[in-house]
């Protein structure tokens, strides 16, 4: 049977991107569909933004501590809008690296939602039907709604 791709990945997060690059490096014709942004939860709205927030939040105490070691740090302040802009710039940079890695490895990318419609068949939200010998589902997950006491104060990746 003839297929459009040897391997097609649904999901452009860390797992999907890695699978696509490895399959392509093994000589396979590879396609990947991502409906949101390349990089997945970790890069776009999870690990990376959290680490940037933690990094920025540590400066206040570091400024105070530095005064005991000869530094003269006066009138420090934090500008939330500048932080948000810088965080978004870093996430954009990382997303571009994920995308560039796919392109450099010869992976055909689709900025689309993909859905299985049968054995070896996928339909994109553009109504394009794609066939693939192998299909990898790398769609990640979603946090569940929390029902514990104090849940209204919790923040999820979504």
Task: Describe the residue ranges of each PLM region.
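Glycine-rich flavin
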Residues: 2-5, 21-28, 33-158
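Beta1/beta-strand and adjacent pyrophosphate-binding region of the FAD-binding site
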Residues: 1-13
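N-terminal Rossmann-fold NAD(P) dinucleotide-binding loop
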Residues: 16-17
């Amino acid at each position: 049977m003839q297929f459009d791709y040897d391997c097609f990945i649904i999901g452009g997060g860390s797992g999907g991107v890695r699978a696509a690059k490895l399959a392509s490096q093994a000589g396979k014709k590879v396609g990947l569909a991502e409906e949101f942004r390349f990089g997945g939860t970790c890069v776009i709205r999870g690990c990376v933004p959290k680490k940037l927030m933690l990094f920025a939040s540590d400066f206040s105490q570091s400024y105070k501590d530095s005064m005991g070691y000869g530094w003269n740090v006066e009138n420090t302040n934090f500008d939330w809008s500048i932080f948000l802009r810088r965080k978004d710039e870093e996430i954009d940079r990382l997303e571009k690296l994920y995308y560039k890695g796919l392109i450099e490895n010869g992976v055909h990318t689709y900025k689309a939602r993909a859905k299985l419609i049968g054995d070896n068949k996928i339909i994109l939200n553009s109504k394009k039907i794609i066939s693939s010998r192998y299909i990898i589902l790398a769609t990640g997950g979603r946090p569940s709604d929390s029902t514990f006491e104090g849940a209204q104060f919790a923040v999820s990746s979504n």
